[in-house]
């Protein structure tokens, strides 16, 4: 609180005591409650859903422990908590479009999302392998060094040399199904996925062949 120190008003008048400022009432905004992750609750929700709230289990598509057995559905195991939460929130607010996922998250609370993400982060990722030996060199070049002449930066700069990503910043890519990674790069390029300006910018510079090569290479990272 500011304090006004009184003095002489003028040399021509007698000194008068300074008037104290009227007390100011301040109302502090309530501090938002800190949400703590409950991985056990996330486990239950992931594997069983919550029929009373219309929440379907995740395991049916994303597999036991987040290791999807189908290339069109992403592996979620060992993914960074903050990244998973962001994607779920983006589906719910429409920033990221996917009719199936938007329906799945419609009744999830912020607590549900954090619990699911915390559970998945603790699961062991089943590693994959690169399938196309003819494109390994190109994929490795793009991932490690980028393509300078096209303005494509190295993927490793953000997603780390082994594809583990950086918690709270960039997702894990190692071991992910190549088909899924390709589909996301195409979505960024075509504008059907818009929740990363950085990735949209990079993807617009990539050809189909480059996307396939780097996606296959990332599938084998460990």
State each model region's role.
Residues 1-39, 89, 209, 219-222:
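N-terminal export/targeting leaders of redox proteins
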Residues 15-17, 69-75, 91-131, 167-172, ...:
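Axial heme c-ligation environment in periplasmic c-type cytochrome domains
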Residues 16-54, 122-148:
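Electrostatic cytochrome c docking/interface patches
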Residues 30-32, 37-93:
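The feature marks the first
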Residues 37, 41-45, 83-86, 100-103, ...:
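Extracytoplasmic/secreted proteins, especially bacterial periplasmic and envelope-associated proteins
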Residues 43-59, 81, 144-156, 168-183:
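Sequence context surrounding c-type heme c attachment/ligation sites in exported
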Residues 55-64, 116, 152-161, 214:
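The canonical Cys-X-X-Cys-His
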Residues 61-67, 121-122, 158-164, 219:
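Detector for the c-type heme attachment site
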């Amino acid at each position: 609180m500011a304090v006004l120190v009184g003095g002489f008003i003028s040399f021509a008048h007698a000194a008068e005591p300074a008037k104290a400022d009227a007390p100011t009432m301040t109302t502090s905004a309530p501090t938002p409650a800190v949400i703590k992750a409950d991985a056990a609750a996330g486990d239950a929700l992931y594997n069983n859903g919550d029929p009373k709230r219309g929440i379907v289990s995740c395991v049916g598509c994303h597999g036991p422990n987040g290791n999807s057995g189908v290339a069109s559905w992403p592996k979620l195991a060992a993914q960074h908590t903050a990244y998973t939460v962001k994607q779920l929130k983006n589906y719910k607010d429409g920033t990221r479009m996917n009719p199936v996922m938007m329906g799945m998250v419609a009744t999830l609370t912020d607590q549900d999302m954090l619990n699911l993400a915390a559970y998945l982060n603790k699961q062991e990722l089943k590693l994959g392998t690169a399938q196309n030996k003819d494109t390994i060199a190109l994929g490795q070049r793009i991932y490690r060094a980028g393509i300078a002449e096209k303005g494509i930066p190295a993927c490793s700069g953000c997603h780390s040399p082994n594809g583990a990503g950086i918690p709270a910043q960039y997702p894990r890519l190692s071991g992910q199904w190549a088909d899924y990674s390709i589909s996301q790069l195409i979505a960024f390029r075509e504008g059907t996925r818009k929740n990363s300006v950085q990735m949209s910018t990079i993807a617009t510079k990539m050809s189909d062949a480059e996307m396939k090569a780097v996606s296959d290479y990332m599938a084998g990272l460990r």
